[in-house]
Amino acid sequence: MKEVPKGTRLWITSDHGMINVEEKIIIGQDNPLLTGVSVIAGEPRARHIYLTEDSPQAREDAASLWQQYLREKALVVTREQAIASNLFGSVVNPDALDRMGEVIAIARGELVLLDVDRADKEGAMVGHHGGDSEIESEVGLLTTTLS
């Protein structure tokens, strides 16, 4: 730091945080969440759901089924709703758009949504991220000007 010129601004940032989870739902195990689903992707707290049929009605039906089952435990939206609400920012890169599921489920509280085929591995992790809690979505930033 001795060699850094006076007046230099120093910015230190961090990654988002993680939470410990208490509740686990295995998608499709003792629940109807795999109805009409082709592939489950994303993080256990932020699932991208790809459907066997990609039509406006199929997206609405799947989002409704997931929301009715999960209730307040998750935010469930169609791709179009996510974009319209700026969930991924005000401008969505076409590459990101291609990767989004037809339906997106973002866990709340201490919930994870485990893929039935990977439940053992995903469920073994203690810390998770990707939900809408403050600790998972805020990134720290410290700034100073060196004198």
Name every feature range the model reports, one short phrase each.
Residues 1-147:
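Feature captures the catalytic ectodomains and active-site-proximal regions of enzymes
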